[in-house]
């Protein structure tokens, strides 16, 4: 089996938490060419969402990261996978 490693690319990401949702969804998510539907219920006690892509619909759960890929694609990523794959970039 041939092994590969991920190329070092810089992405935009935002963690979907109650606190972050109350502060506001980033413009790059709002303006994406994909349908991103994020919502809250019961006064903000429950949050969730869905991202519609060409490959299908993805559920967004609390604490998931929403990522903008290298080609502008928007998709969710579970926190454990995100933290194993990405590290914060100092600007």
Language-model segments: residues:
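Short, compact, well-ordered microdomains
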Residues: 55-91
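N-terminal domain-onset segments
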Residues: 1-54
């Amino acid at each position: 089996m041939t092994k590969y490693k991920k190329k070092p690319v810089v992405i935009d990401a935002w963690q979907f938490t109650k606190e972050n949702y109350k502060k506001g969804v980033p413009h790059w998510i709002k303006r994406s060419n994909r349908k991103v539907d994020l919502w809250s219920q019961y006064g903000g006690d429950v949050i969730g969402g869905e991202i519609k892509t060409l490959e299908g619909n993805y559920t967004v759960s609390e604490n998931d990261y929403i990522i903008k890929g290298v080609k502008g694609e928007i998709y969710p990523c579970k926190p454990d996978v995100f933290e194993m794959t990405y590290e914060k970039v100092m600007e």
